[in-house]
């Protein structure tokens, strides 16, 4: 497991707009992470950051997000 921005297909983050919302924690825990929160103004903008996300779940990597 590792920490990171959980990625949708095509290397895009799960966008979020409220640091205090439970949205990201839900997305992360549903995918097997211990927890998660909304990282505001991070390297990829506002995106969900997961703690202890399983290795088989994709994370955002450098390169383009292909919407």
From Swiss-Prot:
Major localisation: secreted
Domain LCN-type CS-alpha/beta: 2-66
Positions annotated as propeptide: 67
InterPro entries, alphabetized: LCN-type_CS_alpha_beta_dom (IPR044062), Scorpion_toxin-like (IPR003614), Scorpion_toxin-like_sf (IPR036574), Scorpion_toxinL (IPR018218), Scorpion_toxinL/defensin (IPR002061)
Similarity section: Belongs to the long (4 C-C) scorpion toxin superfamily. Sodium channel inhibitor family. Alpha subfamily.
Function of the protein: Alpha toxins bind voltage-independently at site-3 of sodium channels (Nav) and inhibit the inactivation of the activated channels, thereby blocking neuronal transmission.
Name recorded for this polypeptide: Sodium channel neurotoxin MeuNaTxalpha-10
Record organism: Mesobuthus eupeus
